[in-house]
Amino acid sequence: MQIIVNDTSCLIDLRKAGLLHAALLLPFAFQIALPLLRTALLEFTRAEIEDLIARGLAVIDLPPDSVGRAITFRSAYPALSINDCFSMALAESQPGCILLTADQNLKNKATSIGIEVHGVLWVSDQLESSGHTTYEHSMAAYAS
């Protein structure tokens, strides 16, 4: 199963659109780096986080070499937040995975090192093509 590494912006956007639970039904293994869960998802309640984990969101504790890589990214790309760098390091450590982000700086840097990157609209397309939602439902969700 292909892995999708999430940054927080896409999880928040999918939640606001009411599509986060449906996204976790897609045939991908969804992951988030542990530091993001502890710092950037503060607008999610503990119960919401536990529910997402129960639905299949894997929280990955980065090994020391990935933490080191994130710090290297942070030094090389000061426009990226440390959380962006954790996401990029996690994605880089798993060849063939997808990085899901809405952050243009992160998209550009990740693409430049060979990571496949998509955003929320790609998830909407996946939901529609898999029958988990319709185009009309997705557009109504984003309009609200």
Predicted segment positions?
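Acidic, metal-associated active-site segment
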Residues: S81-I98, N105-L106, A141-S144
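Short hydrophobic alpha-helical runs that function as membrane-insertion/retention elements
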Residues: I98-T101, H118-G119
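Acidic, PIN/NYN-like endoribonuclease modules and their adjacent C-terminal/linker elements
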Residues: L34, R46-E48, K107-S144
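Glycine-rich phosphate-binding "P-loop"
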Residues: V67-P78
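Short active-site oxyanion
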Residues: M1-I3, F28-F30, S93-I98
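Short His-Asn-centered micro-motif
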Residues: N6-S9, L34, T101-D103
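Non-catalytic interface/targeting segments
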Residues: I4, S9, L14, P63-P64, ...
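PIN/NYN-family metal-dependent endoribonuclease catalytic core
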Residues: V5, L14-S66, W122
